[in-house]
């Protein structure tokens, strides 16, 4: 609570308000890097995409196409590209920020299961992140091309929200789910001119979950200090541009 903008636990009106509490200004300085870590949490996996296959855990890969709900045009942009999968536990700060500057292009809600996404489950459930409920946020960067941030739902994650879903779409608190749907839903923002700067908040989870990021081929080189299971903080160096 020492890092929270409001450290008085008695003043939070709801459970959701408490678990999505913002941080004090300045407690997560932004590194001088092309790409910063967008969350507090731990590294699940990261690295190069092998053709269209993303490494989940030993003996388990999943395809870009499955992750992006069979959007072939979007999937093709990331073949032989780069990915990072970051896990947020229930104790972590639950807001997600921008790794670099980006213009929002589309947001897609994909219905799915709600498996736990903790490290043990990731090691044992095939195609975990492509099976769970998720929200795909597609951005365009002048410097770095197209990139995607996938907010993956999980057991007891009651909702996912984005900052623009309230400000632009008029949805209370920006919550995308509930309502849950059996159908894929897409919102297009090409004419809305929604620009988010590196470090800006873009969304949040109730409790913990996972963010998967996809970047185009030959756009970045990951921080040499990064390793799977390593703890991470919002704002630290994630990668530099190639």
Which stretches of residues belong to each language-model region?
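Contiguous, well-folded functional domains in the mature portion of proteins
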Residues: 1-242
């Amino acid at each position: 609570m020492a890092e929270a903008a409001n450290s008085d636990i008695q003043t939070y009106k709801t459970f959701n308000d408490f678990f999505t509490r913002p941080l004090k200004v300045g407690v997560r300085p932004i590194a001088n890097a092309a790409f910063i870590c967008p969350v507090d949490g731990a590294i699940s996996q990261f690295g190069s995409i092998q053709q269209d296959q993303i490494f989940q855990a030993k003996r388990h890969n999943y395809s870009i196409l499955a992750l992006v709900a069979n959007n072939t045009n979007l999937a093709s942009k990331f073949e032989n590209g780069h990915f990072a999968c970051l896990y947020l536990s229930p104790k972590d700060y639950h807001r997600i920020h921008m790794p670099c500057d980006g213009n929002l292009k589309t947001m897609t809600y994909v219905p799915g299961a709600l498996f736990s996404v903790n490290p043990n489950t990731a090691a044992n459930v095939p195609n975990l992140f492509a099976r769970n409920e998720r929200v795909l946020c597609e951005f365009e960067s002048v410097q770095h091309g197209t990139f995607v941030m996938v907010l993956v739902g999980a057991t007891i994650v009651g909702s996912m929200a984005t900052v623009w879903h309230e400000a632009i779409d008029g949805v209370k608190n920006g919550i995308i789910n509930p309502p849950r749907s059996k159908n894929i839903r897409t919102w297009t923002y090409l004419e809305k001119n929604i620009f988010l700067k590196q470090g800006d908040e873009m969304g949040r989870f109730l409790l913990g979950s996972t963010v998967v990021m996809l970047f185009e081929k030959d756009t970045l080189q990951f921080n040499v200090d990064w390793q799977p299971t390593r703890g991470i903080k919002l704002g630290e160096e994630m990668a530099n541009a190639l």
